[in-house]
Amino acid sequence: MQGQSQQQAYDRGITIFSPDGRLYQVEYAREAVKRGTASIGIRTEDGVVLVVDKRIRSPLMERTSVEKIHKADDHIGIASAGHVADARQLIDFARRQAQVNQLRYDEPIGVETLTKAVTDHIQQYTQVGGARPFGVALIIGGIEDGEPRLYETDPSGTPYEWQALAVGADRGDIQEYLEEHYSESLDTEAGIGLALEALASVNDDSLTPEGIGLATVTVDDDDGFSQLSDEEIEAHLEERDLLEAEDDADEDDEE
């Protein structure tokens, strides 16, 4: 009984380590990330690809209200998984940091610099009483000094750099697919294909353009960050035979 009450005390105390060195509220925040739909980031030779699963819960919901890919700056995109409201707060923070850097130094913020600013902000909420950790993970991808960079933030406030990663639901299965098929020599087109195939691998090998968000940040593109339209996504799905059949889509609607 005493052990159980001690366990509950560590559960409630965001600033208290358990005897085995764990912060339970941070671990619970990571569980919240797993409840969000999947997001994927892939670093290619000439850019970064971001793909997200943004299926809506009801046909009555406006699709444009579901945002999982965000533009932080002309050369940086961010994908999220977990609590949408928490993601929005961090996206706004990242955008402010990018603007401040541009005004202060008259140059675009570095991808690593922005990531560490965001993770420092996240980390503060793991050691302050009266607050809770952010229940969201971000994939931050962009171009820095002509080179693609790809980072992950997690609820503990730790930044990780990746070649390819997934966050959110089915992370383990998607990550396993990426590890098996990723190559450092991928170009952006091949990176888009790999991300879509990885997401399809946990969705019965079929996807709909309405349920997918896709963006790229490329070295050669003057605009840098670019979000693809439904028509462009549909073309990529058709090219790889990943487009969900209309009969299957109708059955899903009936369910």
Swiss-Prot record:
Pfam families named among the record's database cross-references: Proteasome, Proteasome_A_N
Compartments where found: Cytoplasm
Biological role stated in the UniProt entry: Component of the proteasome core, a large protease complex with broad specificity involved in protein degradation.
Assembly and oligomerization: The 20S proteasome core is composed of 14 alpha and 14 beta subunits that assemble into four stacked heptameric rings, resulting in a barrel-shaped structure. The two inner rings, each composed of seven catalytic beta subunits, are sandwiched by two outer rings, each composed of seven alpha subunits. The catalytic chamber with the active sites is on the inside of the barrel. Has a gated structure, the ends of the cylinder being occluded by the N-termini of the alpha-subunits. Is capped at one or both ends by the proteasome regulatory ATPase, PAN.
Lineage: Archaea, Methanobacteriati, Methanobacteriota, Stenosarchaea group, Halobacteria
Family: Belongs to the peptidase T1A family.
Presence of the UniProt keyword Cytoplasm in the record: yes
Organism: Natronomonas pharaonis (strain ATCC 35678 / DSM 2160 / CIP 103997 / JCM 8858 / NBRC 14720 / NCIMB 2260 / Gabara)
Top-rank taxon, per record: Archaea
Listed name of the protein: Proteasome subunit alpha
GO molecular function, one term: threonine-type endopeptidase activity
Keywords: Cytoplasm, Proteasome
PROSITE patterns documented for this protein: PROTEASOME_ALPHA_1, PROTEASOME_ALPHA_2
